A protein has these predicted regions:
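Short, hydrophobic transmembrane alpha-helix segments
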Residues: 10-23, 35-43, 64-65
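Alpha-helical transmembrane segments and their membrane-interface exit regions
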Residues: 29-39, 55-60, 78-87, 158-163
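Phosphate/adenylate-binding glycine loop and adjacent helical scaffold
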Residues: 1-2, 21-25
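Long, highly hydrophobic alpha-helical transmembrane signal-anchor segments
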Residues: 38-79, 130, 134-141
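Membrane-proximal helix-loop-helix units in multi-pass membrane proteins
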Residues: 67-125
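Hydrophobic alpha-helical transmembrane segments of polytopic
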Residues: 4-5, 26-30, 47, 51, ...
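Alpha-helical transmembrane segments
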Residues: 1-10
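C-terminal membrane-adjacent module
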Residues: 110-197
């Protein structure tokens, strides 16, 4: 799923800079495939039918020159949805999302100082997602399609990766007295988590 997700922004950017409607269509079908990937991996027949039907339905707006408008939606919708996910977990009586993930990855009792820290990391991700949403909407309204695409389909993902790596490095430095796995091992464990939201 992670690697499947990386393909979409690259296809979307390629579609924008080449003005190729076939690549626009492929990017939108790829996005639909990501949305249906869980059901398709569970071999649900309806998911494959939905992918085929959705692919056919996406062909007409793309060929009518409207595909670019659909490509503007994910760079704003994804950070908005993630912001809501992180922010709702910060409500009173809820366990912050990053805290829940850390507890699932941690062996043994979860230390109090890490409970406080992971709450702050959840707040950090709220701020990052809000900034990416504002950036995506502002660029969609005021920038050229090529600049919008470069920023939202390339630079925004670099920012996400940089924040992730910086937070990981800071946590290893600040909380070095706790056991930490290497970055690649940490990423593998993170991708295996089944989180109920």
């Amino acid at each position: 799923m992670f690697w499947l997700g990386l393909g979409y922004p690259l296809l979307a950017h390629l579609a924008v800079v080449t003005h190729d409607r076939r690549i626009e269509w492929l990017a939108l079908v790829w996005l639909l495939g990501i949305a249906l990937s869980g059901a398709m991996m569970q071999r649900r027949p309806w998911a494959w039918g939905a992918l085929l039907a959705g692919s056919a339905l996406l062909w007409w707006p793309v060929m009518a020159g409207k595909g670019l408008y659909a490509l503007y939606v994910p760079p704003a919708a994804i950070p908005a949805a993630l912001f809501m996910l992180f922010a709702l977990s910060l409500r009173a009586g809820e366990v912050p999302l990053v805290t829940r993930i850390a507890i699932l990855m941690h062996d043994g009792p979860f230390p109090d100082d890490l409970v406080v820290y992971t709450r702050h990391v959840t707040q950090l991700w709220c701020a990052v997602c809000a900034a990416l949403f504002v950036s995506a909407v502002t660029l969609a309204l005021f920038a050229s399609p090529a600049l919008w695409s470069l920023m939202t389909n390339v630079i925004h993902y670099v920012v996400l990766g940089a924040v992730f790596v910086f937070e990981y490095g800071y946590r290893r430095w600040r909380y070095g007295h706790y056991e930490h796995s290497g970055l690649l091992q940490y990423l593998r464990r993170l991708m295996r988590i089944r989180l109920k939201v």
